[in-house]
Structure formats: structure tokens, C-alpha cells
Amino acid sequence: MERYDELKKGESGALVSIAAYLVLSAIKLIIGYLFHSEALTADGLNNTTDIIASVAVLIGLRISQKPPDEDHPYGHFRAETIASLIASFIMMVVGLQVLFSAGESIFSAKQETPDMIAAWTAAGGAVLMLIVYRYNKRLAKKVKSQALLAAAADNKSDAFVSIGTFIGIVAAQFHLAWIDTVTAFVIGLLICKTAWDIFKESSHSLTDGFDIKDISAYKQTIEKISGVSRLKDIKARYLGSTVHVDVVVEVSADLNITESHDIANEIERRMKEEHAIDYSHVHMEPLEQK
């Protein structure tokens, strides 16, 4: 039940993000429209996609807390990943829309210099998102949630987007109104890049992709355990933010069942202690004599 308790605690991070994005997106879109800032409007649209992404994380965390059943013997942990994948599609659509609008403005003869209130709005948004980022990063490490850690990274990128918006609007005050539009275009690219990164990571996880470097680290741990004659096979995959490892090891044929079972327990203990892996399935085979 410990993992489910951690997922429950992680909900607060998603809720904080949702609240922050609701406030920021409304303020930025209104001020961006009233004071003629393409960059701030794009920043506000970016925050609306973040609302969707944060809601997806929240839904994923809640579904992931459902215990295993007949249809889902491994639990519902992948709900986090599926929700993130859906959010990436929505973010990509909004990012492309921002690029399209910015592109039209670049080739338009009508370009207005945004008011400085738009710049200060962007600066305030950057400060708020840095605070939310630090909160979610600490919480993500505490509850060991990759989805929440990704949300924290998104918070951080949003802070930098707002800083870029601030710089673009300030530069536009020096009779360079086109800089505000160019900044909006760059923000559109950043939204698309974030969407692609989330899609790439989520699809990699859903297709049972895994980091080879982590597999190598697991191998080193298991091969050092007393009683393990040979590590025959090892596979790992993500189920949401949890790692499941399947191990096949060869042990001396002279060992009895109890001794072999003790080795399996030691493998599970070391994997949890050194790599924070709670789910290890160990299969024992007698050492093949060559």
C-alpha cells in the first residue's frame, strides 16, 4: 500500500499546478489581448495547455491508485503514462496554432507595441511558476513520481517562457514591435518541443522501452550477490512511474529450495535498497554444466 499512498500525496502537486495555471492563463490572455501583446497571449495559451497536462497528471495519479483486479493483474499504474500521451497531442495542436498566428503577424503590416503592463505580467508569472516548480520537484522526489517530476520540469520551462516573453515585450518598447511577435513564434516552438518530448517519453514507456544504462546498473548489482553463479537474463519495464524487473539467474544445482529462495530474496532486497525497485520477479535455474 506504500506506493498507493505516495501516489495519493502526489495529487497535491497536480492541484497546485492546475490552480496556478488557471490564474495565469486567464490574466495573460486578458492582458495580452487588451494591451496588444502577441507574446503574452501565446504565453497564456501555453498555460492553457499546461492546465490540460496537469489535469491529465491528476487523473493518471488517481486511476493509478486503483488496486489490481481481474482485468489488470499488474494494477493501473500506466494510467499516468496514457494521460501524459493524450496531453502531448493537445499541447502540439495549441503549439502549432501559436506558430500559425505568430507567422501571420510577422508578415502583417500591422504591428503594435505592447504596453509595459504586459511585461510585468509575464515577470510575475515567471516568479510564480518558479515557486510552483520548486514545490513540485521536492514533492516528486518525495513520492517518487516520474509524472509529477515531468510536471515540475514543465513548470520550469513555463517560467523560462515567461522570462522570454518579458524580454521580448521590453525590447518592443524600443520601436521594435516585431520582436514581440518573434518571441511569440519562439514560444510556439517551445510548446511544440515540450509536446514532442512528452510524447516521445510516454510512447517509449508504453512500448516497454527502457534505458540500457539502468539495465547495466541492475546487472552489476545482481552479479555481485553471493550465490548467483550466472545472470542468465534480465528485463525491465515501466508501469507508470514504477519499475518492474524480471530476472533469470543460475545457481548451484547442489542448493536446496530454501537456499535458492534466500538468494532470490536477497536479489529483491538489493534491488529495492540500491535502485528503489519494489517489483522484482526472480526465476532460479540450476547452473548449466559445460
UniProtKB/Swiss-Prot annotation:
Q: Which SUPFAM superfamilies match?
A: Cation efflux protein cytoplasmic domain-like (SSF160240), Cation efflux protein transmembrane domain-like (SSF161111)
Q: Which GO molecular-function terms appear in the entry?
A: monoatomic cation transmembrane transporter activity
Bilayer topology term: Multi-pass membrane protein
Extract the Pfam families matched here.
Cation_efflux, ZT_dimer
Answer whether the UniProt record assigns the keyword Cell inner membrane to this protein: no
Which residue ranges traverse the bilayer? 15-35, 39-61, 82-102, 113-133, 159-179, 181-201
InterPro entries named in the record: Cation_efflux, Cation_efflux_CTD, Cation_efflux_CTD_sf, Cation_efflux_TMD_sf, CDF_Transporter
Task: Give the record's keywords alphabetically.
Answer: Cell membrane, Ion transport, Membrane, Transmembrane, Transmembrane helix, Transport
Family annotation (PANTHER family): MANGANESE EFFLUX SYSTEM PROTEIN MNES, MITOCHONDRIAL METAL TRANSPORTER 1-RELATED
What does this protein do, in the record's words? Secondary manganese efflux system. May prevent manganese intoxication.
Quote the protein name from its UniProt record: Manganese efflux system protein MneS
Q: Name the species this protein comes from.
A: Bacillus subtilis (strain 168)
